[in-house]
Curated annotation (Swiss-Prot):
Subunit structure: NDH-1 is composed of 14 different subunits. Subunits NuoB, C, D, E, F, and G constitute the peripheral sector of the complex.
BP-aspect Gene Ontology terms: aerobic respiration; electron transport coupled proton transport
Catalytic activity field: a quinone + NADH + 5 H(+)(in) = a quinol + NAD(+) + 4 H(+)(out)
Listed name of the protein: NADH-quinone oxidoreductase subunit B
Alphabetical list of Pfam families matching this protein: Oxidored_q6
Amino acid sequence: MGIEEKAPSGFMLAKVSDLVGLIRKSSLWPVTMGLACCAIEMMATGTPRFDISRFGMEVFRASPRQADLMIVSGRVSQKMAPVVRQVYDQMSEPKWVLSMGVCASSGGMFNNYAVVQGVDHILPVDIYLPGCPPRPEMLLNAILELHEQIRSEPLGANRAEAARAVEAAALRATPTHEMTGLLA
């Protein structure tokens, strides 16, 4: 005998945060940040065979001001790192980052001075997608995982402050190339 039985038909009971999360996850606009081979697989995700538009991501944005998801696909060189950070800073809040491929996540086979050993050195990363290169199906799965993160994100007056704290903590964290015992 709860309120659900007493509500007239046509009414839905939900929290505002649940509705906002549902709307946000269904309207991600990714910015193009294809830097190497993984970009080919990212482009393939937009083709009719994989159809990323069924998740509300019809068009990859060329302007960071119109995007809220950055998919970093491929290695990031030291010269490109400030540009990647500038594009991230120009994106509107709330914003998310997906690191696509082993090169973006940890530098991959390019273990030298010219390549950033993981994009997490310059950006807070929400989802790491392994593979060289990862298949479009894996990218779609990572996007679905990100959807779940977005849907369950809290709302409130201090949301921007909390986001800055999370970003600062992510940038202070131990980089993946310095971690030991991950495979043991």
